[in-house]
A protein has these predicted regions:
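C-terminal non-catalytic regions of proteins with extracellular/luminal or membrane-system context
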Residues: 1-432
Length: 432
């Protein structure tokens, strides 16, 4: 009998309607994910402006990850392919990253190569505006460039854009799409500003064990709590227009919190979308707590100049909780919580206070893999108590509202992990 399933793809040389629809969606999604890190008015480009294209990444565009992150597609559009007719001036830097292709702390990867630095220096000396495109799945060290280049007028973080990446880049550069992406990681000024910078075994010549001591201070929560200024903050991303955000109200009920954020397009030329972000700060007590924690976010519809939209962000009560290891429980501690609104982790405004009178346990856990020895995690950030007191000062100065918040404990305890009934960890390992 003939085997019907012998080929995983298509043998038809012509793209199907489904492929064409998916390609259009991929182009739209890629453009929406591009992050504008800097713009001194050079973007969007005039399609008729005589400019130049540099950088090996222009023709060797990285579409995605490696290993399990790789996908097979019919064809990919490079940045060069879709811009050679538009006369765009760019310098493109590409980096491969993915499963089995971890980034390296060396020139040509996390750091710029000597050739890239020389190219950019030559462009800077020409006096022409320089537009830098970063086709990389994570940060590239740029502190020296930003400090030393006079004509680095725009930076776009493309990440890995998929098969329609070239078209998406052209859409953003030429103003057919307006940037609306936000950074999902903090970009440090120096690599060693990252608390786990030296934890990776590949840097120590021993990949058998990595010890992470960040504790609750992972990513932006470390930079924010310890007062380390990043190059680009978590949640950051510019637009071709400007937005104003303000807290429009809070709905506080037992076990429920909702924050209304009004977003207005204050620009005069471009329609665009903005992401409203709500963060919570917690009382500093017996446990180390981050200065602020992202609790919710939402994106507006496409707002025309002068248009306003009010978003409602539902905040689960667990966002107020901290994990108490000695209790194996998530607990909302008694004390004062701050509600912050903004559009990145370093551009926030305190808009209200929540006061919890008594601690409430929301969830109990059952450890399967308890630590075998102390890890020595980071302790409380210096000045944490002072920052908490500063919230009260802001409350008085700005007459901020204070809401009583009553956490609601679940009616029944969380079920035990079913594997625990089989024995201890050592006896379970062969089963995993």
């Amino acid at each position: 009998m003939e085997q019907p399933f012998t080929h995983s793809g298509t043998r038809d040389p012509a793209p199907s309607p489904r492929e064409q629809e998916n390609a259009a969606l991929a182009r739209q999604a890629a453009a929406a994910g591009i992050v504008l890190l800097k713009n001194r008015g050079v973007l969007p480009l005039n399609p008729g402006a005589p400019v130049a294209l540099f950088g090996a990444g222009a023709g060797r565009t990285v579409k995605g990850g490696t290993g399990s992150g790789d996908v097979n597609n019919r064809a990919s559009v490079s940045i060069w392919q879709d811009l050679k007719g538009a006369k765009a001036a760019l310098y493109v830097i590409s980096r491969i990253a993915g499963e089995g292709k971890d980034r390296r702390l060396e020139p040509g990867d996390y750091y710029l190569s000597d050739a890239e630095r020389a190219d950019l220096q030559t462009l800077d000396e020409s006096g022409l505006p320089v537009v830098l495109l970063l086709n990389a799945g994570g940060p590239v060290e740029l502190t020296g460039l930003l400090d030393g280049m006079q004509h680095l007028d725009a930076i776009l973080q493309l990440s890995q854009l998929g098969q329609q990446g070239g078209q998406a880049v052209a859409d953003v550069l030429l103003g057919r799409a307006v940037p609306e992406g936000k950074l999902t990681a903090t970009w440090a000024r120096r690599y060693d500003d990252i608390p786990c910078a030296r934890a990776f075994g590949s840097l120590k010549g021993d990949v058998s064990q990595d010890t992470y001591r960040d504790g609750v201070y992972v990513g932006y929560r470390y930079f924010d709590s310890f007062g380390v200024r990043p190059l680009f903050a978590f949640g950051f991303g510019l637009s071709y227009t400007t937005f104003a955000l303000r807290a429009a109200g809070l709905d506080v009920q037992p076990g429920h919190l909702a924050v209304q954020v009004e977003v207005a397009n204050t620009g005069a030329r471009f329609a665009g979308r903005e992401v409203a972000q709500v963060y919570l700060s917690a009382p500093q007590g017996e446990l180390p707590r981050e200065r602020r924690r992202l609790a919710g976010f939402a994106k507006t519809r496409r707002l025309a100049p002068g248009e306003t939209q009010t978003l409602t962000l539902e905040i689960p009560q667990k966002q107020l909780a901290a994990f108490h290891p000695e209790q194996n429980a998530w607990v909302v501690d008694a004390g004062l919580y701050g509600v912050w609104v903004g559009n990145s982790s370093d551009a926030l405004r305190l808009c209200a206070m929540l006061e919890v009178d008594a601690a409430v346990t929301l969830e109990r856990t059952h450890p399967i893999c308890p630590p075998q020895h102390p890890i020595g995690e980071l302790g409380a950030a210096p000045g944490a108590q002072d920052r908490e007191a500063d919230q009260w000062r802001q409350k008085v100065e700005y007459d901020l509202p204070v809401y009583k918040f009553v956490p609601v404990a679940p009616a029944a305890p969380a079920p035990a992990a079913p594997l625990l009934a089989e024995g201890d960890l050592d006896s379970l390992v062969p089963l995993l």
